[in-house]
């Protein structure tokens, strides 16, 4: 979740961050999800482990996009979380990123918001260009020194 927050901060996107359990505090969860739209929330990023019902329940109650982050678990390495989040019934979609994929969740949220925000879209384009430049620099270094010396 920290990686998602770092990305949102990088793009200047305001957000709420809470620790809420759909199982251990259902009343608080229902109130949060049902009032998110009136608070101005446009996208929910929900991380969950094990049974991982939080993102799906958010999607059932919140009328706008929900991004689920399956969290790594000790018993099954996060696969339980991944399957729980990705296997949603028809009509209740949850966009799902990789296990512990907070950074991509933040980027996906930014891209969703950028549909109606040209300034944010420009920042995302700059971010993509920065990533491309980073790869080009790594390739130039590889071409210059060869693979034997690349990581030394």
Question: Which residues make up each language-model segment?
Answer:
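Glycine-rich phosphate/diphosphate-binding loop of Rossmann-like nucleotide-binding domains
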Residues: 1-24
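C-terminal binding/interaction regions
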Residues: 3-4, 79-152
């Amino acid at each position: 979740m920290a990686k998602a927050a770092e990305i949102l901060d990088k793009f200047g996107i305001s957000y709420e961050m809470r620790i809420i359990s759909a199982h251990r505090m259902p009343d608080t969860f229902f109130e949060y999800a049902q009032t998110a739209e009136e608070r101005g929330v446009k996208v929910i990023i929900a991380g969950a482990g094990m049974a991982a019902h939080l993102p799906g329940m958010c999607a059932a109650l919140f009328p706008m996009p929900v991004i689920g982050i399956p969290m790594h678990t000790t018993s099954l390495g996060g696969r339980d979380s991944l399957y729980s989040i990705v296997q949603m019934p028809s009509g209740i979609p949850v966009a799902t990123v990789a296990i512990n994929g907070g950074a991509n969740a933040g980027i996906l949220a930014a891209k969703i918001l950028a549909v109606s925000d040209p300034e944010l879209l420009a920042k995302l384009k700059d971010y993509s260009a920065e990533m491309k430049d980073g790869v080009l620099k790594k390739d130039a270094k590889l071409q210059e020194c060869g693979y034997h010396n690349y990581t030394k």
